[in-house]
């Protein structure tokens, strides 16, 4: 009996010690304690069932099933909601680092500090690039000013400026080669020695040609010798005819007169032909003068067609050929964009936040009062620990537009519709303003909120806006002529494509 009592006392103590060890070894206190308490309850039930004997077997099975159901209920009640578990979950990298030995973790932290210093160097690199862009933009400014003057008919380029002056490219079109080639091509390097030997033969052949000309003259001289023989035969035939027809007699005095008449007839015809030619020459200028006078009289009421000044619609065509901007330009935007005289790019000054600004200069127009429309892009220039690869290049952080001072009834960014309300039973017409698709929405981008997130539609608009700003910055301002001529073909990235004057390219 004493031994049985000792066993009954020692078993619960052992189970209690085991429970304490399991609780201390586990990391999740709530779930592990629940499991330990459930295991203790099962152990107590098993110990009580062992003392009760085999007669209480069915009762023990029912108690075990009841304990499992109660355990599941406790687990469900104490389970942490999924969103909060996600919030508490640490990144995979930290979990991996936490499992490393302490000495290795210290070294990893030292590498993190080195990476922070590298990010600071990258920020200096980006600022240096910005300073270089500002420097070379000042060098390009005189060229951009000349481009502005030619487009807006303030300066007429000279003939030398209109010629293709590229040193890398040569004339290659067939027409230009035929026009510019001399009558005698210069000898090649291998043919310089052979040509002098061939030249005497050519000269000899050229000398032989005049010798043949006298032979031709001799043949021409021989022809008149045959003519008297023909005349003699004709005289003989005429004598035979005279003998055969003795009735017909001609006076010898009349024959010379007939010959004289035959000689005078060709002279008279030649004189008449010459007189007719002279009369035609005299009449042609008179007819031309009359035609020119009639044309002048007809053109008095019509204005003369003058050559266009400058390059009309230059920037309208350029923007329409830009990949992202072309679809934004509507038909009702084009008359406004015809007043666009220049698009310039300006960089922020030293000491200010890194940014660049596009200035759209407009001539006085009947649509809005602004002379310049501005769009500014702010660049991320500080390291961001949430984005470790920010230093791969420029990244636009935010953009700001400007307010357009539209004239009355000329705002193309909105449309006014009339909605009918029948709340009082009467039909009332109330105007309602609805946003409209337009290029000029480019100057009113969605604002990024300080707290919260943008809607998906606004977020997509902002992403596309950032792409447009990058294209304008990289390509359009510097190489607008290729967009005007259509050589870009509306594409942004075209590796291996050559630009320039197609007419004179090899």
UniProtKB/Swiss-Prot annotation:
Recorded GO CC terms: chromatin; nucleus
Q: Which UniProt keywords apply?
A: Nucleus
Gene Ontology biological process terms in this record: nucleosome assembly
The primary site where this protein sits is nucleus
| UniProt key word Hydrolase | no
Q: Name one GO molecular function term.
A: chromatin binding
Q: Where is the composition biased (Acidic residues)?
A: 157-178
Q: Where is the composition biased (Low complexity)?
A: 35-70
* Residue ranges, compositional bias (Basic and acidic residues): 196-296
The subcellular localization recorded is: Nucleus
- Segment Disordered: which positions? 1-95, 157-307
Q: Which family does it belong to?
A: Belongs to the nucleosome assembly protein (NAP) family.
Provide the protein name. Nucleosome assembly protein 1-like 3
